[in-house]
């Protein structure tokens, strides 16, 4: 449906009068020329036609989120309080005020509102988000998650001052699908021809801790959305290919920081981080494959955050900044690609990577923080290289503001490297750690690398003397607490 607003012809999605619309749809306006600039003024409102009630509104005068780092007081420290993941129902923007605190945190909301807030995946502390994103000739309006319901007609009203040279509209209507899908295979397509338009919409449709296996098939396309999955299990998330299905968002620690009164990312099972583009939190028995997940923000900004057990990734391309991926739990990765900055891989769990390619722009690839009784990061037949010729290193495990990691473990078996420092590792804080390698070769020549100047706490494994140890660390089930990943 094409209409004229201001001086530019515009196409609406969903089209005016459309039926069978996904309940997680975005509102997309496509112009003949570049999309007009947003003005940081005006309102977007959604009305339920039958009742006349306004069921959602976006105030464009409220900034999306912070653009500068917070200042924290001395009372803000890493919490050791176990986070309570139990819930009898999934909170949404329709039932709970966004910013309602959990896990001992202070409220995220303020009165009047400092920033936009959106409950995603039932996380009531909420996320800052961009209510409108423009790309080229397209403007996408992001409603609050889970405000639309099945089998209802809605009317969209957009004030004239939301965009420059815009006359506004208040007669854009559409009707959602009659009911939710009833099968265990859910389809996602951004064009609205499947069960859901977004990855998050499909995740929200799956019960917590499901004992029934589910599959989410994500069609080829570009999905610009912040994804947070909590309490999911027995789930396969499958895209159309690493470079065909792209899920991305501009998120980082500055934009979605930890609460004012507590820090995150130190003790497993405590208050979750909100800074990644794609988050699997308190999840078990998940397979992700044939997909690209990416943060487009700089700083402490993971493309993927995993808190969970028995999480398997195959042919997943992860792109981030500092800490490109954070992994806590038991994680298996095969034929994956990773691009990031220093500390590309931050982890407190047991992680086994097989035939993966890791690239960064200089500095350490890992910061290993596994605890006693758990294996750390193990790389088998992986490659390590740099994108700009700067020197890289395998990783580090220094003290962190007084905290040390005496049981940190990183093992490299038959890996290939380029532009790696002679020491291999840049910082190993304790002699009790286990940082070892076997058969490391040059990525370009295939020849063995010179290990004569390796870090004093690093260990070279011998093919004969350490034969059993090498075999053990080459076996996923040994590293992952008995779990043998299957795709």
PLM region spans:
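Acidic, low-complexity Ser/Thr/Gly/Pro-rich repeat segments typical of extracellular/periplasmic
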Residues: 5-180
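Sequence-level preference for short, compositionally simple segments enriched
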Residues: 177-193, 197-487
């Amino acid at each position: 449906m094409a209409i004229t607003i201001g001086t530019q012809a515009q196409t609406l999605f969903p089209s005016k009068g459309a039926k069978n619309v996904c309940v997680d749809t975005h509102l997309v306006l496509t112009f003949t020329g570049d999309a007009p600039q947003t003005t940081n003024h005006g309102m977007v409102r959604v009305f339920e036609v039958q009742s006349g009630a306004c069921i959602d509104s976006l105030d464009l005068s409220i900034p999306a989120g912070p653009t500068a780092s917070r200042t924290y007081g001395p009372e803000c420290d890493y919490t050791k309080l176990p986070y309570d993941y139990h819930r009898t129902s999934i909170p949404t923007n329709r039932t709970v005020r966004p910013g309602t605190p959990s896990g001992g945190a202070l409220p995220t909301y303020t009165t009047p509102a400092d920033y936009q807030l959106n409950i995603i995946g039932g996380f009531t502390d909420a996320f800052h988000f961009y209510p409108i994103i423009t790309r080229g000739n397209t403007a996408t309006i992001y409603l609050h998650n889970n405000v639309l319901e099945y089998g209802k007609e809605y009317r969209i009203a957009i004030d004239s001052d939301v965009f420059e040279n815009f006359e506004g509209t208040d007669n854009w209507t559409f009707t959602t699908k009659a009911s939710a899908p009833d099968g265990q295979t859910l389809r996602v397509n951004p064009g609205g021809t499947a069960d859901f338009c977004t990855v998050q919409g499909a995740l929200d449709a799956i019960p917590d801790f499901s004992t029934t296996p589910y599959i989410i098939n994500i069609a080829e396309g570009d999905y610009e959305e912040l994804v947070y999955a909590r309490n999911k299990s027995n789930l396969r998330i499958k895209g159309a290919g690493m470079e065909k299905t792209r899920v991305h968002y501009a998120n980082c620690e500055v934009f979605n920081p930890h609460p004012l009164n507590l820090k995150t990312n130190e003790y497993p099972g405590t208050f979750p981080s909100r800074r990644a583009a794609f988050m699997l939190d308190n999840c078990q028995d998940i397979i992700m494959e044939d997909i690209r997940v990416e943060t487009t923000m700089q700083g402490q900004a993971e493309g993927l955050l995993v808190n969970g057990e028995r999480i398997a990734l195959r042919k997943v391309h992860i792109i981030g900044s500092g800490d490109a991926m954070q992994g806590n739990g038991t994680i298996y990765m095969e034929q994956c690609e990773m691009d990031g900055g220093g500390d590309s891989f931050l982890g407190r769990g047991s992680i086994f990577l097989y035939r993966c390619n890791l690239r960064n722009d200089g500095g350490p690839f890992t910061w290993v923080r596994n605890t006693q009784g758990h294996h750390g990061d193990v790389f088998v037949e992986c490659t390590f290289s740099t994108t700009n010729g700067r020197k890289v290193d395998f990783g580090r495990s220094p003290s962190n503001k007084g905290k040390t990691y005496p049981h940190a473990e990183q093992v490299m078996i038959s890996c290939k490297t380029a532009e790696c420092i002679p020491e291999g590792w840049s910082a190993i804080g304790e002699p009790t750690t286990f940082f070892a390698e076997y058969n490391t070769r040059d990525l370009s020549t295939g020849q063995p690398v010179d290990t004569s100047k390796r870090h004093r706490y690093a260990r070279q494994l011998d093919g004969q003397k350490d034969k059993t140890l090498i075999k053990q660390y080459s076996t996923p089930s040994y590293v992952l607490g008995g779990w043998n990943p299957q795709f």
